[in-house]
Amino acid sequence: MGACDIVTEANISSDIDSNATGVTAFSMPGWQLALWATAYLALVLVAVVGNATVIWIILAHRRMRTVTNYFIVNLALADLCMATFNAAFNFVYASHNIWYFGRAFCYFQNLFPITAMFVSIYSMTAIAADRYMAIVHPFQPRLSGPGTKAVIAGIWLVALALAFPQCFYSTITMDQGATKCVVAWPEDSGGKMLLLYHLTVIALIYFLPLVVMFVAYSVIGFKLWRRTVPGHQTHGANLRHLRAKKKFVKTMVLVVVTFAVCWLPYHLYFLLGHFQDDIYCRKFIQQVYLVLFWLAMSSTMYNPIIYCCLNHRFRSGFRLAFRCCPWVTPTEEDKLELTHTPSLSVRVNRCHTKETLFLVGDVAPSEAANGQAGGPQDGGAYDF
């Protein structure tokens, strides 16, 4: 690829053609730059405030500290960091075609975005796996608190390892007086290495986890909506519990679909560049990239909105978090939603070969956090 790398994001750059002397000037009118800056600023603010609030709601209230919610915290943290460190700085780079932030941040910028995206989608995958075990195999041992922390740490370590090659080959170059942050793959096989690496990354951080989640939620949906136990009718607390499960699954499916839709055009854009690399030299491509990059980064701000709209506890949490706003009036019920722990009752269902626990309310936070074995014991997680 030549020097036309303006809209290849810093962390997805190509090899350097040291003999290239021409450079494509990408500029836009001031009013257009102001509109883009406003759009990206709004995105960052909504994502940072929303995800920070989600983290506070879960960590500050003992009732919310379930295994599933710890994965949601991990997802929110990754999205918050993605919006803060990737959206803002890469917008500046893409809109000016000059790297202002130094060599150290160039390394970081080629390491962190892939890391954060991997953490985001595999946190969603972990939630799908946890729900699969709870609903499809309710009597199998569940993740404990230490086990959950180990999974989260493992996700971050694998993500860093996957992103390391780009960081390793990162460098700062000068192109006719303009500073660029690029990834300089080895000259003898740079094009092949770049394509292979991008295909591997896209497969691991997009297609593979989406397939896993599709299968998991399909089986869960079949279990909840199709499967019935002969002679057993769901009513009362059990019916509420079943409805909570269904609502949780719908919420997480919406989160996954939103992520997939936001990121697909962005991945296709870079795959297209491998087979038609002169497209990056065309004037219109800057605007195309800014649209696709905004769409991809916007995935970081939708989850808090989805939680608030579809889950009453998160809605109560948001009202408490923004109670200083004159148009927000939290109630005592909002406080109880996040602090009160309903009682637990037990009875035996003779339709099964094993004794089954049925919840009147939610499981105690300590039990949920410790991931006690048995499906019904994670009842609180279905309601977040």
UniProtKB/Swiss-Prot annotation:
InterPro entries linked: GPCR_Rhodpsn, GPCR_Rhodpsn_7TM, Neurokn_rcpt, NK2_rcpt
Gene3D superfamilies with a match to the protein in the record: Rhodopsin 7-helix transmembrane proteins (1.20.1070.10)
Disulfide pattern: C106-C181
Positions of glycan attachment: N11, N19
Residues on Extracellular side: 1-32, 91-107, 171-196, 273-290
Localization terms from the record: Cell membrane
Residues where lipid is bound covalently (S-palmitoyl cysteine): C324
Chief location: membrane
Domain of life: Eukaryota
GO biological process, one term: positive regulation of flagellated sperm motility
Residues in the Cytoplasmic compartment per record: 57-69, 130-149, 219-251, 311-384
Pfam families, alphabetized: 7tm_1 (PF00001)
Transmembrane segments: 33-56, 70-90, 108-129, 150-170, 197-218, 252-272, 291-310
Keywords from the named record: Cell membrane, Disulfide bond, G-protein coupled receptor, Glycoprotein, Lipoprotein, Membrane, Palmitate, Receptor, Transducer, Transmembrane, Transmembrane helix
Membrane protein topology class: Multi-pass membrane protein
Assigned GO CC terms: plasma membrane; sperm head; sperm midpiece
UniProt cross-references to PROSITE patterns, sorted A to Z: G_PROTEIN_RECEP_F1_1, G_PROTEIN_RECEP_F1_2
GO molecular function: substance K receptor activity
Membership in a protein family: Belongs to the G-protein coupled receptor 1 family.
Function, as annotated: This is a receptor for the tachykinin neuropeptide substance K (neurokinin A). It is associated with G proteins that activate a phosphatidylinositol-calcium second messenger system.
Protein name from the UniProt record: Substance-K receptor
Species this chain originates from: Oryctolagus cuniculus
